[in-house]
């Protein structure tokens, strides 16, 4: 008798994706982040669902409803902080996952990579709208500042902003629609993640060497299921350390003050995972220029496969490219730090230099480094 997991229409899909999947025998822990992102997504949907049961998307009661969740709902505080810090864990895993893709040349799987970029944009949109929902000071002013950026679009900008707001300022209509979109987007992300996986399984996984591994494959289960469980345990350990010991470490104290349209906080800044893009936005004195740089800082990922000039796929055996990659990582950390600093000397010039470096490394230095390596190897 044939095993049911290989014949049942639904079980067959699961089997081919998670059990009998032929996997390269040498993939490292950097390949764990895909499954960790899946765990983060499930965790966010579950905690978010329970939060939505008690949350009210009205400007008068939103802040109070979050307070009510933390004080009066059974285990409401842990659900709320798991959701808030879960978003941070989600982005840590996302950045690691993208970094892995850049380092090992996984971006040569074009469809998988491009859907990944769409997933990143959808996740960023979801996180932004989620940050608005508690209706604290930073929620309100963050929403005002970021949505206002669309007014930089020539001719239709102002109308577009008012259309998104549902009025002439961020108000009740804005909060209600942000809640609706924040609720629906994770399910769209789930569907996109399935398509992401579908395209990945068409080609099979990449591996650290970047060399095709068709001759050396092992089944996903038990080898990588156990490895993923270890990764998941570490993820949950770090998340729960954050939630139970320093739940507000990554948040902004201003968000414990109810939203007040008449009082602007001294430093408006987004959550830490958007600071690098925020620093790039602020480093350009022109509004439209800043918005374009902000959008390009993410969409530049789409260009990466076309900027690949090396004869090798992975950076494993390319020391000059490795240097460029780690300079890029340092540059992104610098931008993240600058994004959280006030707009004054010397932060302005550091931010501008780091922003120029960011685009220069990806568009010029990395392709040049690859060409130099090709010549050194006489390829």
UniProtKB/Swiss-Prot annotation:
Cofactor dependency: heme b
Sites where the protein binds heme b b566: 97, 196
Annotated localization: Mitochondrion inner membrane
Positions with a binding annotation for a ubiquinone: 201
InterPro entries: Cyt_b/b6_C, Cyt_b/b6_C_sf, Cyt_b/b6_N, Cytb/b6-like_sf, Cytochrome_b, Cytochrome_b_C_euk/bac, Cytochrome_b_N_euk/bac, Di-haem_cyt_TM
Residues where heme b b562 binds: 83, 182
Main localization category: mitochondrion
Membrane topology recorded in Swiss-Prot or TrEMBL: Multi-pass membrane protein
Keywords: Electron transport, Heme, Iron, Membrane, Metal-binding, Mitochondrion, Mitochondrion inner membrane, Respiratory chain, Transmembrane, Transmembrane helix, Transport, Ubiquinone
Source species, domain of life: Eukaryota
MF-aspect GO terms: metal ion binding; ubiquinol-cytochrome-c reductase activity
CDD domains: cytochrome_b_C (cd00290), Cytochrome_b_N (cd00284)
Cofactor note: Binds 2 heme b groups non-covalently.
GO biological process terms, semicolon-separated: mitochondrial electron transport, ubiquinol to cytochrome c
GO CC annotations on file: mitochondrial inner membrane; respiratory chain complex III
Transmembrane residue ranges: 33-53, 77-98, 113-133, 178-198, 226-246, 288-308, 320-340, 347-367
SUPFAM superfamilies in alphabetical order: a domain/subunit of cytochrome bc1 complex (Ubiquinol-cytochrome c reductase), Transmembrane di-heme cytochromes
PANTHER family associated with the record: CYTOCHROME B (PTHR19271:SF16)
Family stated for the protein in its record: Belongs to the cytochrome b family.
Remarks, miscellaneous: Heme 1 (or BL or b562) is low-potential and absorbs at about 562 nm, and heme 2 (or BH or b566) is high-potential and absorbs at about 566 nm.
Reported function: Component of the ubiquinol-cytochrome c reductase complex (complex III or cytochrome b-c1 complex) that is part of the mitochondrial respiratory chain. The b-c1 complex mediates electron transfer from ubiquinol to cytochrome c. Contributes to the generation of a proton gradient across the mitochondrial membrane that is then used for ATP synthesis.
Assembly and binders: The cytochrome bc1 complex contains 11 subunits: 3 respiratory subunits (MT-CYB, CYC1 and UQCRFS1), 2 core proteins (UQCRC1 and UQCRC2) and 6 low-molecular weight proteins (UQCRH/QCR6, UQCRB/QCR7, UQCRQ/QCR8, UQCR10/QCR9, UQCR11/QCR10 and a cleavage product of UQCRFS1). This cytochrome bc1 complex then forms a dimer.
Protein name (record): Cytochrome b
């Amino acid at each position: 008798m044939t095993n049911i997991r290989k014949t049942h229409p639904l079980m067959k899909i699961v089997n081919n994706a998670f059990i009998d999947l032929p996997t390269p025998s040498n993939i490292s822990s950097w390949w764990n982040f895909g499954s960790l992102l899946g765990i983060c997504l499930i965790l966010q949907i579950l905690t978010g669902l329970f939060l939505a049961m008690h949350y009210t998307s009205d400007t008068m009661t939103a802040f109070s409803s979050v307070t009510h969740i933390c004080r009066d709902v059974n285990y409401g505080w842990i659900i709320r902080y798991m959701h808030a810090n879960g978003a941070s864990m989600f982005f840590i895993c996302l950045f690691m996952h993208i970094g892995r893709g850049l380092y090992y040349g996984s971006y040569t799987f074009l469809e998988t990579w491009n859907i990944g970029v769409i997933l990143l944009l959808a996740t960023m949109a979801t996180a932004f709208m989620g940050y608005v929902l508690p209706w604290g000071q930073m929620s309100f002013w963050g929403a005002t500042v970021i949505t206002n950026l669309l007014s930089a679009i020539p001719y239709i900008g102002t109308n577009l902003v008012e259309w998104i707001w549902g009025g002439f300022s961020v108000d009740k209509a804005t909060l209600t629609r942000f809640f609706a979109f924040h609720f629906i987007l994770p399910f769209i992300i789930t569907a996109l993640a399935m398509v992401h996986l579908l395209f990945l399984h068409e080609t099979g996984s990449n591996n650290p060497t970047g060399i095709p591994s068709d001759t050396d494959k092992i089944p996903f289960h038990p080898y990588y299921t156990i490895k993923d469980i270890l990764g998941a345990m570490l993820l949950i350990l770090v998340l729960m350390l954050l939630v139970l010991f320093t739940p507000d470490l990554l948040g902004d104290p201003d968000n414990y003050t109810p939203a007040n349209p008449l009082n602007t906080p001294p430093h408006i800044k987004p959550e830490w995972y958007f600071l690098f893009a925020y620093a790039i936005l602020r480093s350009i004195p022109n509004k439209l220029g800043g918005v374009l740089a902000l959008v390009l800082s993410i969409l530049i990922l789409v260009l990466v496969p076309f900027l690949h000039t090396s004869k090798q796929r992975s950076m494993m055996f390319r020391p000059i490219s490795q240097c460029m990659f780690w300079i890029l990582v340092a540059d992104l950390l610098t931008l993240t730090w600058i994004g959280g600093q006030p707009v004054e000397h010397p932060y302005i010039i550091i931010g501008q230099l780091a922003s120029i470096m960011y685009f220069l490394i990806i568009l010029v230095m990395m392709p040049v480094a690859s060409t130099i390596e090709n010549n050194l190897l006489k390829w």
